[in-house]
């Protein structure tokens, strides 16, 4: 798989079957996160795996793939050989719909269950009840740390511009983190169906409590004042001829991201920062991935995102932040024999009290989490 895949196996040098029920894996580098991947990776017969495996999966779950109409629906049938309790539903049709279409289908009584966005949670539909599920899903905005002018190679060897003249200033990044009101955002955007995010791994054992920051608009303004960002006639700050203004990109087909972006821009006005929101397709967003703030969505039951978003050469290091201390902790976290021993190391990569370094809001503030 590719390096940006949740099932990244690029570090596996060789897999050797020692007998009918055991396999030994040899790696190119220490990488204990592979254990998380193996926990969810399907194991299939060699003869059944090929280029068309994705369209003809083999598994031991409750259901089997009966039909796949790409872009429209999949039809599942109960697996007669399932080892557990017999499925109560013998046939399941999963229709692929945008969130507004799913809501309309529920209103028309065309579906039994509809997955839609929290922005619609205040709407009632006869004979349906709302089910809210807790997740590890999070939303965060990358804040490019370099000065503009450089380039960085992305997918396909394309050189993308790097750096932002506003978010390059650590005072701006810290002020944004302290100035955003997450509770108000949750109330206004998703009708209270959410919890504040302070990192990509808040609910995980490798999450750091030092990532949590209370909203303090006065302190955020103080940081900007002390850094020389003075308010202009229109209330927007400037420093050395640079206006405190930047574009924020989000996926235009996501109503929650659109609403979060708008609320974020509105809150930043109080700090004297002008944010222009830009809804676009991912094809149009990626050229800006290292030069402009982007609202991303993350969520994993493995520390892979904690590593990749913060490691210097990580595929998710859109902030382009490089720090030897952070890298060292992340590398050490991957190398320890027992994953439980990696938790504290991942936490120190986020904030190390001894060195006063890390990606936390009081440190490099490379992201602002919502």
Q: Can you describe what each PLM-predicted range is?
A:
Residues 106-107, 112-116, 123-130, 266-316, ...:
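Periplasmic binding protein-like
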Residues 163-265, 348:
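Append "and occasionally in soluble cytosolic enzymes with long acidic Gly/Pro-rich linkers
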Residues 77-80, 137-172, 179, 188, ...:
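A bilobed periplasmic-binding-protein/Venus flytrap-type ligand-binding module shared by bacterial periplasmic
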Residues 1-29, 46-66, 120, 234, ...:
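Surface-exposed, Gly/Pro/Thr- and Asp/Glu-enriched linker/hinge segments
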Residues 49-51, 80-124, 265, 274-276:
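Ligand-site clamp/hinge motif
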Residues 134-136, 140-158, 283-337:
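Acidic-aromatic pocket-rim loops
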Residues 9-18, 165, 170-174, 186, ...:
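Extracytoplasmic/peripheral linker and loop segments enriched in polar/acidic and small residues
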Residues 10, 21, 30-31, 36-87, ...:
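Gly/Pro-rich hinge or "lid" segments in bacterial periplasmic/extracellular proteins
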């Amino acid at each position: 798989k590719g390096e940006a895949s949740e099932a990244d196996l690029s570090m596996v040098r060789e897999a050797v079957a020692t007998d009918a029920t055991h396999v030994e894996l040899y790696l190119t580098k220490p990488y204990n996160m592979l254990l998380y991947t193996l926990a969810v990776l399907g194991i299939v017969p060699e003869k059944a795996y090929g280029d068309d495996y994705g369209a003809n999966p083999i598994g031991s779950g409750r259901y089997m793939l009966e039909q796949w109409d790409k872009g429209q629906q999949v039809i599942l049938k109960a697996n007669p050989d399932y080892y557990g309790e017999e499925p109560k539903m013998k046939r399941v049709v999963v229709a692929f719909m945008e969130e507004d279409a799913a809501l309309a289908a529920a209103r028309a009584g065309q579906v039994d269950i509809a997955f839609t966005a929290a922005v619609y949670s205040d709407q009632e539909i006869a004979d349906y009840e709302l089910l809210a599920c807790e997740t590890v899903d999070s939303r965060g905005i990358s804040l490019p740390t370099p000065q503009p002018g450089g380039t960085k190679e992305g997918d396909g060897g394309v050189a993308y511009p790097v750096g932002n003249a506003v978010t390059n200033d650590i005072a701006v990044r810290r002020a944004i983190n302290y100035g955003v009101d997450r509770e108000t955002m949750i109330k206004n955007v998703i009708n209270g169906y959410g919890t504040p995010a302070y990192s990509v791994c808040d609910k995980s054992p490798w999450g750091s409590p030092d990532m949590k920051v209370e909203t303090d608009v006065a302190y955020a303004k103080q940081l900007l004042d002390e850094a020389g960002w003075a308010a202009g006639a229109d209330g927007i700050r400037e420093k050395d001829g640079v206006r405190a203004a930047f574009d924020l990109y989000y996926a235009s087909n996501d109503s929650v991201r659109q609403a979060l972006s708008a609320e974020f821009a509105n809150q930043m006005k109080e700090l004297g920062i002008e944010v222009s929101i830009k809804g676009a397709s991912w094809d149009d967003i990626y050229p800006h991935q290292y030069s402009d703030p982007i609202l991303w969505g993350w969520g994993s039951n493995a520390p892979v995102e904690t590593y990749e978003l913060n490691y210097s050469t990580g595929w998710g290091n859109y902030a382009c932040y490089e720090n030897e201390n952070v890298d060292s902790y992340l590398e050490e976290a991957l190398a320890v024999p027992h994953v439980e021993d990696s938790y504290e190391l991942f936490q120190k990569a986020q904030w190390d009290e001894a060195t006063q370094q890390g990606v936390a809001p009081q440190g490099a503030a490379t992201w602002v989490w919502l």
